[in-house]
């Protein structure tokens, strides 16, 4: 908004930089084109590009401040364990609505390794489920209440199926495999129900069910070889 398109063209021409005009810039089927044409009408009403640009700048400044506060809140009563993002339920409940939304959106985006944050409608649905203390599935994550806390964990059905046990490979865009030798006869995949059956009943209780089944483990065919978060004990 700070610069006219013609100004940008002039700069490119001055520096003899080749450029192409985007043909969609004159296509009214695109919202941005229709909005750009409306700016002329807005200017006649006193709402010119300078004022809109200033408003956008103020909104960006407010966004930066809110994000800073959200980070501060996470550092005070948030944590990360077994790849889950965890919030204290009571502390989270006392936050302003906007900060709750920012924390949940960031948590879902981080846990799922998605490029874009979830839609606002999904975050609000997630907030409703938190207030009702029911589980919520969305954006490849599951959010649920556990021991006076809110947990955002990876959804098992959204995880990558499996990868070969090769040093340096990344599983599910989250976990890096570190091994002294490549073991291509082994695979890395989520622990799942099958792997869970290899663990002693008392050991399973150390990690919540929804979390543990989506954690990576080392398998040979269907047999659990290693689960780095616990010491598996064969039945």
Describe each region flagged by the PLM.
Residues 45, 56-235:
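AMP-forming adenylation/ATP pyrophosphatase catalytic core
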Residues 1-56, 88-90:
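Catalytic subdomain that performs nucleotidyl-dependent activation
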